[in-house]
């Protein structure tokens, strides 16, 4: 069950945009999907920064972009914040899910309800810079059907200040996905896809999976030449708490097994060997090293 808070089309047409300056057309050409849980404090800065980013572009298509917040029944004032933003003329709506949970299924729900032919997924915590969204959308306006915001592009490094063991784990995680896709950052949650490519993958998507971008990269069947990459710097969380915990790596490995079977029908031995190495590093860094005071 879910509750959608959305102004009716006629009301949108009568509403004069406030500081947003967005088009209020009922048929947006682009959609930005934002899965959220207890992110109320970040919603206003997210929407207003997106508005400013679109306003700085000369593209009329970008001006006609909708934002869809898919909220897992946070009850933290998110609905009221979106309602206030709507009254100010921002093209934003919220879907409140009362019986479903999880980031991947929230993204899938948003993509299914999006009216734009070009769709972007981004986090609500402002670690994905709203100012980079126009570049991702423009990258889909051509021959590309998938665009990935990468933290490993030229001049960008997310993990340069990480400890050695964490950098090795990060590199190992990307290495494990290499046979599945040539994308430099398949674990990124900042990505875009065309409606057509999403529909190709929709019946095969694991909505309970972990990394939805990787799932879509594999199951939409996009060729490496159809993937664009836009480097971005991974920002600091502005409000709220990080939802990462020690289970994320194991969820990722479970997803990789499912994707290898989907793509190749089997799991190669090299995958098992790298998994054992990554697990050994994880156990050392999170269990043994703290016990030994290393």
UniProtKB/Swiss-Prot annotation:
Q: Which domain of life is it from?
A: Eukaryota
The UniProt record gives the binding positions of GDP-alpha-D-mannose as 35, 39, 70, 72, 123-125, 127, 151, 211, 237, 243
**Residues the record lists as binding Mn(2+):** 125, 127
Q: Which residues lie on this side of the membrane: Cytoplasmic?
A: 1-263
Its placement in the membrane is given as:
Single-pass membrane protein
Q: Where in the cell is it found?
A: Endoplasmic reticulum membrane
Q: Which cofactors are named for this entry?
A: Mg(2+); Mn(2+); Ca(2+)
The residues that hold Mg(2+) are 125, 127
Q: Recite the UniProt cofactor note for this protein.
A: Binds 1 divalent metal cation.
The residue ranges flagged as biased composition, category Low complexity, are 17-27
Q: Which reaction does it catalyse?
A: a di-trans,poly-cis-dolichyl phosphate + GDP-alpha-D-mannose = a di-trans,poly-cis-dolichyl beta-D-mannosyl phosphate + GDP
The protein's Enzyme Commission number: 2.4.1.83
Q: What keywords does the record list, in alphabetical order? A: Endoplasmic reticulum, Glycosyltransferase, Magnesium, Manganese, Membrane, Metal-binding, Transferase, Transmembrane, Transmembrane helix
Q: Which stretches of this protein does UniProt put in the Lumenal compartment?
A: 285-294
Ranges annotated as spanning the membrane: 264-284
Which Pfam families does the UniProt record give? Glycos_transf_2
**Which SUPFAM superfamilies does the record associate with it?**
Nucleotide-diphospho-sugar transferases (SSF53448)
Q: Name one GO molecular function term.
A: metal ion binding
GO cellular component assignments:
endoplasmic reticulum membrane
| Pathway(s) per entry | Protein modification; protein glycosylation
The role this protein plays is: Transfers mannose from GDP-mannose to dolichol monophosphate to form dolichol phosphate mannose (Dol-P-Man) which is the mannosyl donor in pathways leading to N-glycosylation, glycosyl phosphatidylinositol membrane anchoring, and O-mannosylation of proteins.
What family does the Swiss-Prot or TrEMBL record give for this protein?
A: Belongs to the glycosyltransferase 2 family.
Name assigned to this protein? Dolichol-phosphate mannosyltransferase
Q: Which gene encodes it?
A: DPM1
């Amino acid at each position: 069950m879910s509750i959608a808070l959305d102004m009716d089309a006629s009301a949108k047409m009568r509403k004069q945009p406030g500081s947003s300056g967005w088009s209020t057309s009922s048929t947006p050409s682009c959609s930005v999907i934002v899965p959220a849980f207890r992110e109320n404090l970040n919603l206003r800065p997210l929407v207003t920064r997106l508005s400013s980013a679109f306003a700085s572009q000369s593209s009329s298509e970008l001006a006609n972009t909708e934002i869809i917040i898919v909220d897992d029944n946070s009850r933290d004032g998110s609905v009221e914040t979106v309602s206030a933003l709507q009254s100010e003329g921002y093209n934003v709506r919220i879907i409140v899910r009362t019986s479903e949970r999880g980031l991947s299924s929230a993204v899938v729900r948003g993509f299914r309800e999006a009216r734009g032919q070009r769709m972007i997924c981004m986090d609500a915590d402002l670690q994905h810079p709203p100012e980079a969204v126009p570049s991702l959308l423009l990258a889909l306006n051509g021959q590309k059907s998938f665009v990935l915001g990468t933290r490993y592009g030229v001049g960008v490094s997310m993990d340069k200040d990480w400890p050695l063991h964490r950098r090795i784990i990060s590199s190992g995680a990307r290495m494990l996905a290499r046979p599945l896709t040539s994308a430099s950052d398949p674990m990124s949650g900042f990505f875009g896809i065309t409606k057509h490519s999403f529909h190709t993958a929709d019946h095969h998507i694991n909505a309970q999976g972990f990394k939805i971008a990787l799932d879509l990269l594999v199951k939409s069947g996009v060729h490496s030449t159809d993937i664009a990459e836009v480097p971005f710097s991974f920002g600091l969380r502005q409000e709220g708490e990080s939802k990462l915990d020690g289970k994320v790596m194991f969820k990722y490995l479970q997803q990789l097994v499912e994707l290898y079977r989907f793509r190749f029908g089997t799991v190669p031995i090299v995958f098992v060997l790298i998994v054992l190495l990554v697990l050994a590093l994880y156990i050392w860094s999170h269990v043994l090293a703290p016990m030994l005071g290393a």
